Regions:
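A glycine-rich phosphate-binding loop feature that marks nucleotide/adenosyl-phosphate handling sites
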Residues: 152-155, 234-236, 289-300, 338-349, ...
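Short, hydrophobic beta-strand segments
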Residues: 113-119, 306-309, 355-361
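C-terminal hydrophobic structural anchor segments
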Residues: 315, 320-380
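Gly/Gly-Pro- and Ser/Thr-rich, intrinsically disordered tail segments characteristic of DNA damage-repair
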Residues: 1-232, 281, 365-414
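Short, charged/polar surface micro-motifs in flexible loops or helix N-caps
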Residues: 11-13, 42-45, 300-304, 348-351
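DNA-contacting surface of Y-family translesion DNA polymerases
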Residues: 188, 196-338
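Short small-residue beta-strand/loop micro-motif enriched in glycine and branched aliphatics
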Residues: 79, 303-307, 352-354
Length: 414
């Protein structure tokens, strides 16, 4: 039976979700219809652009650039702060809907997922019919729009979902690759970043078709093993199956795809802090502590690596989770640049008390618990963005508020 995959991608996720929240709160202006961005500290004009509206794009505003630069381009720009709790809530709602159509759902990032729809035609009709059903249901029930790509493998499904937006369904079958994908700039190929695109251009490779028509050996000679991978991608070949999103009742986790590849572990410190902050917050909200911390990294060759450690005492402290995760991340950092960072807290139990030994700094732990509780109380009363760690407001793009960013283009698990 021929395989059929869907790639479901939320259109301008963070901006759309912020717009919906504002409208539900009584705003008469839809952020999606005006020059608006999701960014850092508006009062201090710190940080970077994490997501932008279609009108903002017309001013040349780019995801990842500083808010200062964005305001130069558009002085009347509306800036709203990031709200990771809001993103997690909407992401969960999306995945809940997708799980109604197949048990094989792989959440690729907070705002996109792959579905193995093979063999579901008797239930939901032909692929195009099923895709439009999902698209319309998300818009009707959740209030935001998605693109759905349909293809015989994940790679082509993802490429298809990036065609014309928003709120569209596109196919990219093998027989359509030459006409639909090959004419695109090589920089549009999945896995080709700006630096790789420049190098390909310097070799006379400007379109995906140019790369596809190269001799395979030539691609390998020019770009090594990465050249072989990209050559296969350009020819529409990708064999990885959808990995079913396992529901782990005792696991809390988040991951994020970065807006650009990270060469050094310290480049991911702020992102890891934000992820641990979110995980710790949800553990505390549910009255849970975790004994196992797992860190996952994906490099720019799409190789996944994960390390975990068992804590001597369970915890839900953001500070403790962060320091353990940072140590793991430094131990496992791969040779190639990293494109995805994730952390999960597992083997959870009821939050009773933390057993201490002679070497435990009781005063420090007590202080951290009070800080966590105070921050949680403020967020509960005033919203998820009420308290933001200073590190995450840095204008230095090495400290990604990229957490929230990474996507306009590009897991929360519980």
């Amino acid at each position: 039976m021929p395989k059929i995959y869907f790639h479901v991608d939320v259109n301008s996720a963070f901006l759309s979700w912020s717009a919906l929240k504002a409208l539900q709160g009584g705003s008469t202006v839809d952020l999606r219809t005006i020059p608006a961005v999701v960014g850092g500290d508006e009062a201090k004009r710190h940080g970077v652009v994490l997501a932008k509206s279609t009108p903002a794009k017309k001013f040349g505003i780019q995801t990842g650039e500083s808010l200062f630069a964005a305001r130069v381009k558009c002085p009347g720009l509306t800036v709203v702060p990031p709200d990771f709790d809001l993103y997690v809530k909407n992401s969960k709602a999306l995945i809940q809907i997708l799980n109604d159509y197949t048990p094989d759902v792989e959440q690729y990032s907070i705002d996109e997922a792959f579905l193995d729809m093979t063999g579901t035609e008797a239930l939901f009709g032909p692929p195009l019919t099923a895709a439009h059903t999902i698209r319309r249901r998300v818009r009707r029930e959740l209030g935001f729009t998605v693109n759905v790509g349909i293809a015989p493998n994940r790679l082509l499904a993802k490429m298809a979902s990036d065609f014309e937006k928003p709120d569209r369904v596109h196919t990219l079958y093998k027989y359509e690759v030459e006409t639909k994908m090959w004419p695109l700039p090589v920089g549009d190929l999945f896995g080709v970043g700006p630096s790789a695109a420049k190098r390909l251009n310097s070799c006379g490779i400007y379109t995906i078709g140019d790369l596809a028509r190269l001799e395979r050996d030539t691609a390998v000679r020019l770009f090594g093993s990465r050249g072989d991978t990209l050559w296969n991608y350009a020819n529409g070949r990708e064999a990885d199956p959808v990995t079913k999103q396992r529901t782990r009742d005792n696991s809390y986790g988040n991951s994020v795809t970065m807006p650009r590849d990270l060469a050094r572990p310290e480049d991911a410190d702020a992102t890891m802090l934000a992820l641990c902050d979110s995980v710790g917050r949800r553990l505390r909200a549910d009255g849970k502590t975790a004994r196992v911390v797992t860190v996952q990294l994906v490099d720019n060759a799409f190789r996944r690596t994960s390390h975990q450690t068992t804590l001597p005492n369970p915890t839900n402290s953001t500070d403790r989770l962060y320091h353990v995760a940072i140590e793991l991340m430094r131990q496992m950092w791969p040779q190639r640049p990293v494109r995805l960072v994730g952390v999960s807290a597992e083997k959870t139990g009821e939050d009773n008390f933390e057993q201490m030994d002679l070497f435990t700094d009781a005063a420090r732990i007590d202080k951290q618990e009070k800080l966590d509780r105070a921050a949680d109380a403020l967020r509960k009363k005033f919203g998820g963005a009420a308290v933001t760690r200073a590190t995450l407001l840095s204008p230095d793009t090495r400290k990604p508020e990229a957490l929230s960013a990474a996507k306009e283009r590009e897991k929360d698990k519980k």
